[in-house]
């Protein structure tokens, strides 16, 4: 029974990723086992950049002037003039057609973020200097505040993360990953890590996604990017790529900021800065997301 369920799980992942045979093989480095994202599939994905370093993090558009990303992407003292956001396109090239570079007006980091590795509150909002036109973007939907997230739900992570040679992906990568139970993730992170003995690693505002065997979903350069799930025919951002121990290591899945815990703060920040409520129009097309959720509810518990 266990092997049969696992076969179903692997087959579904191959269908969703275009039949790639390397979906569960670790070692490549970037979004491990991912594939090039089709044009227009993830229209909210942006690249956070500095003039000196180029691409440093991902992010997601939630409004015509607002980007959601990770707090650890920034350095203190905060200086918005150091940063720009590239909107549109699939590559990191600044000359790519249908893309634009927008200056950042303000940076809002969650007040309790500690500016240290694996800190809670790893979330930030960027206010763009110039509003985007409706033809330039499609915002991702945000979840309801404190919405529960079900382990086993298959979601998607995207980004231009680094390879093991520390090179960035030339084209935006996408990968389907299952959400993991937080207590299971906590136990995994303590395996082989004596320095973590007695310490709580996965905080209540974090969630894990990836593969127990070591097939990590994201790597350096993916930070700040979105983890989205197809829920009620819409793409909902449930996580922000935050941290992990290495890339593609067994028992060290990707850790994400749990977006439902911060929806109230996001709404309050937008309201305090005279922005109307965000609105999304990102429909999850195709039958695969719904099919995957139905079948994985049966197959995944025995396969992982």
UniProtKB/Swiss-Prot annotation:
Selectively cleaves synthetic peptide substrates of trypsin. Activates the epithelial sodium channel ENaC. One of its GO terms (biological process) is proteolysis. The keyword Ion transport applies. Pfam families: Trypsin. It comes from Rattus norvegicus (Rat). It comes from the Eukaryota. Belongs to the peptidase S1 family. Residues 22-30, 276-304 form a propeptide. The keyword Membrane applies. Inhibited by aprotinin, leupeptin, benzamidine and soybean trypsin inhibitor. Partially inhibited by PMSF and DFP. Residues 31-271 form the Peptidase S1 domain. Keywords: Cell membrane, Disulfide bond, Glycoprotein, GPI-anchor, Hydrolase, Ion transport, Lipoprotein, Membrane, Protease, Serine protease, Signal, Sodium, Sodium transport, Transport, Zymogen. GO terms for molecular function: serine-type endopeptidase activity; sodium channel regulator activity. The active site is at 72 (charge relay system), 122 (charge relay system), 223 (charge relay system). Expressed predominantly in kidney, small intestine and stomach and moderately in thymus, lung, spleen, testis and skin. In the kidney, expressed mainly in collecting duct of renal medulla and cortex. GO terms for cellular component: extracellular space; plasma membrane; side of membrane. It is found in: Cell membrane. Induction: By aldosterone. Residues 1-21 form the signal peptide. Optimum pH is 9.0. Glycans are attached at residues 79, 232, 273. It is a lipid-anchor; GPI-anchor. Disulfide bonds join 57-73, 155-229, 185-208, 219-247. A lipid is attached at residue 275 (GPI-anchor amidated serine). Its EC number is 3.4.21.-. This is Serine protease 30.
